[in-house]
Amino acid sequence: KFVQRKYYGYEIDDSKPVVISTWQSLATFDKKYFEKFDCVVGDEAHLYKSKELQKIMNACINAKYRIGTTGTLDDSKVHKLVLEGLFGRVHNVTTTRELIDKKQLADLKIQCLILKYSQDECKHVKKLNYQEEMDYIVSHEKRNKFIRNLTKTRTGNTLVLFQYVEKHGKVLYDLIGDTLDHQTRKLFFVYGGTETKDRETIRSITENENNAIIVASYGTFSTGINIRNLHNVIFASPTKSKIRILQSLG
């Protein structure tokens, strides 16, 4: 009656006063469209440092009430100032430790696995730039087979996160799938091209499973996704982003 959804798969109905939308769906709208809003609520507010989201927020010139929610801010002063300019002063309402103690977040255990490479490989990689080194790491056959074996030997539902779809995500999915007993264990692949409804279906199925594997991109399964029945997360691709790591763990 009062709420409309404005993203892929839903028809536009401007007769309803409350709009729930992705920023991608709103990015094509004219500035005038946003003048009618009195209130803006931005979930995953740490993402609002992007130019497109700032453009949308700045177009909401009549929005007196602005609320941004996030569990992760990075350590950059500039990042914090940008968000305060859009939403107002930051208020910390709780901590990760408090949420873990209240059983609202998982009491996680972090295991850092260090893979050792040959001297010749180290000498070769030393000459590469950042992107070339990343490409070398994610295409390393032994490393990918190690991730496959690690994934298959975990007990419970396991999420494997990757950064590059073609050169890493699909490779891992095929490696795991080729040697998996599909009768006893479900395997899913999720990336930017996966429909929103299909992602939700996969999430729902996993919550009712106890030994499923999801191979997913950081972009689709590191922010805004909540799987209550998840036992293991494997970071298959290297990342320096504090927010990405914390969001994935959350």
Task: Indicate residue ranges for each PLM-predicted region.
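Conserved Walker A/P-loop ATP-binding site and its immediately adjacent core
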Residues: 1, 53, 75, 164-169
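Conserved helicase ATPase core of P-loop NTP-dependent helicases/translocases
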Residues: 2-15, 159, 168-171, 184-222
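A short beta-strand element within the Helicase C-terminal
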Residues: 35-41, 215-216, 223-238, 247
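Post-DEXD/H (motif II) to motif III coupling segment of the RecA-like Helicase ATP-binding lobe
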Residues: 38-39, 44-111
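Conserved SF2 helicase motif VI
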Residues: 57, 73-74, 240-250
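Conserved interdomain hinge at the start of the Helicase C-terminal
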Residues: 124-163, 167-181
